[in-house]
């Protein structure tokens, strides 16, 4: 327990933990003696972050420097998604992905490829014929194999692990009715893993999803993973995306999922991790009352009040204790962005909203 508390204390000193507030940048400039995230957790798990193209290229030099100092694993936020890397059937765009992999290699980092199959940000041509109708099963299998073999093959021996399939299960445990599912059924998932393993037999392969604390989704993921293992299809880890807030998910429920996933024999990875200090978006809010709506969703435009900051830190400490309790099965914790300024939730669902 003392060891855990010392590590958590170190982390808290970094002002913002893995959400990495803007003060993190100032801390990085003050002294080289303070503990880094990767050093503080070196006996527990890899500490990772998502990089955008500006950080990879060095245009955001401070963001890149912070990432290299505090993390030992990186994932491309968007550069390897289908719509970006394979925008047309016979054309690939490699510049951003190549630069990302080189940055990781040059700095001895554990490199994650994200993601090979995802219904969102899928290239518009991928699932349809010249008339805009769904392609047949054999055509999609051929396209899927070519896409995965080309990308994974290009980075064979360089990218250490791949998010092969992303977000294929919905909360009630049914399969998402994506184009991949409509055309190939459940089989598109094991096929994707099979193709990835063919392209690089040494790479780790992951299934990644959000809301993994939800029992319906949890149960189906466990069944799916066990089925693939029984068929001899390689899958190394289950990624729990972990977009958290001050009161969600319930940590007991989250732990139940973590233990269930570990029970498959897979490793568990905390992926796309962030923890918002802002109120949960209320789908029933009166959006016609623009002023009240914006105030409700963006209550701290000038910074977090001290009591909210303290509550956030306490919540973060509880989350980190949970991760460390299960460091025997958790092999990586990846923050979704280097700083609050990089959050995918800034300006959503109202313009000017600041994410903390």
Language model regions located:
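Aromatic-lined carbohydrate-recognition surfaces of secreted/lumenal glycan-active proteins
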Residues: 48-53, 164, 192-217, 269-272, ...
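Acidic (Asp/Glu)-rich catalytic clusters
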Residues: 38-42, 62-72, 98-110, 152-156, ...
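Short, acidic/polar
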Residues: 54-70, 143-151, 217-228, 316-322
């Amino acid at each position: 327990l003392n060891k855990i508390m010392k590590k958590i204390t170190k982390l808290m000193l970094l002002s913002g933990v893995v959400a990495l507030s803007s003060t993190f940048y100032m801390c990085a400039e003050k002294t080289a003696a303070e503990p880094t995230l990767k050093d503080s957790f070196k006996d527990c798990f890899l500490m990772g972050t998502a990089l955008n193209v500006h950080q990879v290229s060095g245009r955001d030099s401070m963001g890149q420097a912070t990432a290299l100092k505090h993390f030992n694993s990186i994932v491309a936020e968007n550069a390897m998604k289908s719509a970006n890397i394979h925008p047309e059937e016979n054309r690939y765009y490699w510049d951003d992905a190549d630069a990302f992999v080189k940055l990781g290699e040059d700095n001895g980092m554990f490199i994650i490829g994200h993601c090979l199959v995802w219904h969102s940000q899928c290239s518009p041509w991928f699932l349809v014929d010249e008339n805009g109708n769904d392609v047949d099963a054999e055509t999609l299998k051929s396209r899927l194999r070519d896409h995965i073999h080309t990308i994974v093959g290009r980075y064979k021996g360089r990218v250490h692990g791949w998010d092969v399939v992303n977000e294929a299960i919905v909360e009630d445990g049914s399969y998402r009715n994506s184009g991949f599912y409509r055309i190939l059924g459940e089989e598109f998932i094991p096929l994707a893993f099979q193709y990835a393993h063919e392209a690089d037999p040494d790479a780790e392969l992951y299934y990644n999803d959000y809301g993994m604390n939800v029992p319906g989704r949890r149960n189906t993921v466990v069944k799916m993973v066990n089925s693939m293992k029984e068929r001899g299809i390689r899958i190394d880890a289950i990624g729990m995306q972990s977009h958290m807030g001050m009161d969600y998910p319930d940590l007991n429920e989250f732990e139940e999922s973590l233990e269930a996933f570990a029970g498959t024999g897979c490793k568990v990875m905390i992926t796309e991790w962030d923890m918002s200090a802002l109120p949960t978006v209320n789908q029933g809010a009166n959006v016609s009352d623009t002023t009240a709506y914006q105030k409700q969703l963006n209550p701290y435009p000038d910074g977090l009040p001290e009591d909210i900051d303290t509550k956030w830190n306490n919540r973060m400490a509880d989350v980190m204790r949970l991760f460390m309790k299960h460091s025997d099965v958790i092999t990586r914790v990846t923050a979704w962005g280097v700083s609050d300024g990089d959050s995918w939730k800034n300006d959503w669902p109202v313009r000017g909203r600041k994410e903390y």
